[in-house]
Amino acid sequence: MQLNTLSMVHEFLRRTVKPGDFCIDATAGKGRDTALLCRLTGDAGRVLAFDIQEAAMAQTKALLAAEGLTAEVIRDSHANMERYAAAETVDCVVFNFGRLPGGDPSIFTRSDTSVAALEAALRLLKPGGVIAIALYYGGANGYGERDAVMTWLETLDDRKFSVLR
């Protein structure tokens, strides 16, 4: 297995997500995480996928259709995920912060909405639920988002949350 960020996150998800789980892909992008979550949760599960870019939504929908998978693909900011799920009902939330590979380089996740989305994800998580975060930084987005997310992670109560970096 090639070790890169995506393969490590996917291995973590394979060991964590179960059939029937309710999962959110907060940054759908090309749909790879969404498709994996759909396969892992099965017909009894539920998957929401968020993105603000039409191109990302189209790629996600095409991948799901090609694999015969179903998810609710929503064109909205990940910061608004609480509009679509109730508190303490979600088993897993996945984030890939940065930009859509091959997409418009002027569109990328931002620290203000990303931290708001992480806070929303915590409120949506069931006890024992997990959040997986992949941070891609540099380029036009610089390091501000990375720094904001890392600072936010440091504020979590370590008696309630475990953070693996």
Where are these regions (language model features)?
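Conserved beta-strand signature within the Rossmann-like core of class I S-adenosyl-L-methionine
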Residues: 27, 117, 124-135
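Conserved glycine-rich SAM-binding loop
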Residues: 29-31
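Conserved SAM-binding motif I beta-strand of class I
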Residues: 46-51
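Mobile active-site "lid"/loop adjacent to the S-adenosyl-L-methionine
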Residues: 95-117
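Helix-to-beta-strand junctions that scaffold the AdoMet/dcAdoMet cofactor pocket
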Residues: 18, 41-42, 125-127
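S-adenosyl-L-methionine
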Residues: 1-22, 26, 35, 39, 57-91
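Class I S-adenosyl-L-methionine
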Residues: 139-165
